[in-house]
Amino acid sequence: YWSGYNQIMASNLMDSGLSPDEIINYLIENDVNNNPTIRQYGVVDIYEGGRSAAYTGGNCMDYKNHILGTNYAIQGNILLNEQILINIENNFNNTIGTLSDKLMAALQGANIPGADSRCLDNGTSSLSAFIRVAEPFDEPDNFLLDLNINNTNNNQEPINLLQNLYNEWLNEQDPLGDI
């Protein structure tokens, strides 16, 4: 369960110079609802060698886990199986480009019917999808990139819809595209 308070705390702790491991430990010990077992956290510090840390609470719904690597922390719960996380990791690592390019490719790794096991009957990967990238001095309501497909209808694939929005966003950033 997402908590805006916990997210703000994590951001403030990162700004104060704590390591990803220290931030995760703080969040577990100081959960806003005193129930970290229902949470998943991932923290990456791309400015200090790509350090990463994660936590998956025991009361998150199965399949649940996380994968860590340099410059990434991948978390998932209510997943069809472990392969979803592996696909996400492979897409992230095998994509050349900006952080946003790598994140969008990672999301495509979960573009499998039932990746969120609640959506198998719909034939979609999930109910919604979003991508958010912030630069160091972005304001909370004005990120470099903040795209969201929320609760799609008619069995539309949210990751494909998000990919379309992302492609439009890319074209707005560089209207000439690749030359």
Which sequence ranges carry the predicted segments?
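N-terminal nucleophile
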Residues: 1-179
